[in-house]
Swiss-Prot record:
GO terms for MF: ATP binding; ATP hydrolysis activity; ATP-dependent peptidase activity; serine-type endopeptidase activity
Active site: 747, 790
Ranges spanned by the short sequence motif Microbody targeting signal, renumbered to the chain: 854-856
Every Lon proteolytic domain range: 655-841
Catalytic activity field: Hydrolysis of proteins in presence of ATP
Organism of derivation: Xenopus laevis (African clawed frog)
Annotated stretches, region: Disordered: 586-614
Protein name: Lon protease homolog 2, peroxisomal
NCBIfam families (UniProt xref): lon
InterPro entries reported in the protein's UniProt record: AAA+_ATPase, ATPase_AAA_core, Lon_bac/euk-typ, Lon_lid, Lon_proteolytic, Lon_Prtase, Lon_prtase_N, Lon_prtase_N_sf
Amino acid sequence: MASSGSIQIPRRLPLLLTHEGVLLPGSTMRTSVDTPGNMELVQNRLLRGTSLKSTIIGVVPNTSDPSSDREELPSLHRIGTAALAVQVVGSNWPKPHYTLLVTGLCRFQITEILKERPYPVAEVEQLDRLEQLSSKEEFKEALGDLSEQFYKYAVQLVDMLDNSVPAVAKLKRLLNNLPKELLPDVLTSIIRTTNEEKLQILDAVSLEERFKVTIPLLLRQIEGLKLLQKTRNPKQDDDKRIVAIRPPRKLGNISSKSFSLENTDDDDEDSDDIIILERKIKSSNMPEPALKVCVKEIKRLKKMPQSMPEYALTRNYLELMSELPWSKTTRDRLDIRAARILLDNDHYAMAKLKKRVLEYLAVRQLKNNLKGPILCFVGPPGVGKTSVGRSIAKTLGREFHRIALGGVCDQSDIRGHRRTYVGSMPGRIINGLKIVGVNNPVFLLDEVDKLGKSLQGDPAAALLEVLDPEQNHNFTDHYLNVAFDLSQVLFIATANTTATIPPALLDRMEVLEVPGYSQEEKLEIAHRHLISKQLAQHGLTPEQIQIPQEATLEIITRYTREAGVRSLDRKLGAICRAVAVKVAEGQHREHKSEHLEAPEGEERKESVPEGSKSATINDTADFALPPEMPILIDHHALKDILGPPMYETEVFGRLNQPGVAIGLAWTPLGGEIMFVEASRMDGEGQLTLTGQLGDVMKESAHLAISWLRSNAKKYQLTNASGSFDLLDNTDIHLHFPAGAVTKDGPSAGVAIVTCLASLFSGRLVCSDVAMTGEITLRGLVLPVGGIKDKVLAAHRAGLKRVILPKRNETDLEEIPLNVRQDLEFVLAGSLDEVLNAAFDGGFSLKTTPDLLNSKL
């Protein structure tokens, strides 16, 4: 007859596969559930169940990789523990999972797997707790002295511990109240054992075998406590703890973490990790304030249960602090001659940037503790601002890290999040230092002019401390909450324009202008760098393709219109792809022709195109011979691959009537030529302006018409009715083509005056002249910016003469020598000089003297 201690479990049980810990009957374990099958079990069985039976599950140890997503069911341990699900707690951080608290009931053996999806269900056979021994005499006859010996060792172990500790008092009550046949399972769950040893206890179905396996574990624990008491400081006896001696490790041990409710063990691996982490922090040579913070956090970590969310946050913080390069640096390569050669090999032109880097190296040789400069490269896209930053790091022998700031609108991206927030992390500056592993890298702050602003703060304001040499030696990230020295970091910022950079941030940086390339510079860059790069990317060799300079120049002038070389690089890539197709087809035809045999009595004929010449990219028939190597890229090949030219020289065709002039404009993409068109009609003296003009440009137009009206008699300018009042019964319409593009600035003033003078005089402006400059009401020409980009735009358009303000004469030194030799520059200080240079034969003043009236 069964006693009250017997348990009856269902014949079919859903299986919970555990990768952490082994549950024994009579013990409690807390386990994390995150695999798909276990998640389905919790959601569909435990959370939706309404009866006690639905909370009974089978807990089976699974030694396979928990991260594997294999669809087939892994080989399971054949013996498991029937358990009662006591508590289910769900969480979404750091990923969706459940924490399950289960209590072991009895052992069972899997006889058959009934189904595997959505969670495994098995038919089981109960192995113990079927019927208890009816009396102590029967129990003693069954096991003899074995149970008494086990009980004696268990009592000895408990007596060696401090009874004031609640866990020890609870263990003592269990020894007095629990049946002896349950003690091996309970004690094994409490003392320190490996998963392999717990599996041996689980597999011990008979009581005799279970006692035999458990007794050596108790003896090992007792001997360890005796040894510890001998070596322990007597003064520390008042602070007794439950001490567990680590068993000898074996290579085949299964790594696990025990979450038993009564378990007082700390995980071996976590303990080792904390010790290693503490050593790393002490050896990191961090400053004293940071070290004090880390020591304090380690003490908190040791006292903190692993189940607390703050445990992982604190550990991540300490790991970051130990990995930061507080004192690790790289030695600068200070060979100026080698640096000059390396910079010249990597980048063509850019003389100003190279000069600044060499100056830094020279000063660095004379002064070792020089702070890193804060440089800002400003120029149009595609001119190599980002790549030259990488070359500077290579030249100095430093680590390089790029931080993309385009679109960043949260100041926490720079300064980090405070650790009180969920998902907090350090800012990009500290994270970049962790990645490179040294405290003197080259940091490239890319697209600093495209920073945003939102309710989360202004990242540009957060950069003020980072980019200030007087403050960044004490940069404080919100996540670290301790100061970090950034004074050895070489910061390089890139931008397309300084107009959108806050003045306070711009003042902290040394701005270096990176102008666009001339046609000759693009040609040189293409044949030095771009063509070889594209050939390597497409698996081609110079023996297979030839791109002469004439073809490259045609791509530059007729297929691209840019200050940099990105579009040119893409066009060269398109050519290489087309050639790769021809080369691959030719190899296929050669391979195919080797296997073709002519029929008997006939000769194999090969069709050779008449007038065959050196191969180009033009399409040939499928049965034509493979193209001859190398494939030459000429004008016809460019048209076949890239299509008709996208840009044509249209300057001369648009200056065929009065009232049209060419101005020069600067954009973030480089310089551009800008047409100004004017027309007049009968009206009421109104001036109409179109072409998406800004306020400054509108004021320049009104200024130009006012100056011409005041000087109309001087230049013999009249309206349609012959009046010197140019707006008398006359309306004027000024238009700036490319109406979808916003235009503003004062530099179009001279072009507007010239356009209106051409309109009212009926004379054509010279078709090869472009001009730029601000005007005043007195007829003076004031200097403007962007001279180099504007002159390069005029040179690209095929113009021959450029009218510039006289006070911009010093800017001509920045223009390449070959461009200066191709152009004629007219430096004008007044509008009189501008008009004389813009028209063939000059723009003469009134020469007829006034009639003298006699006063006699």
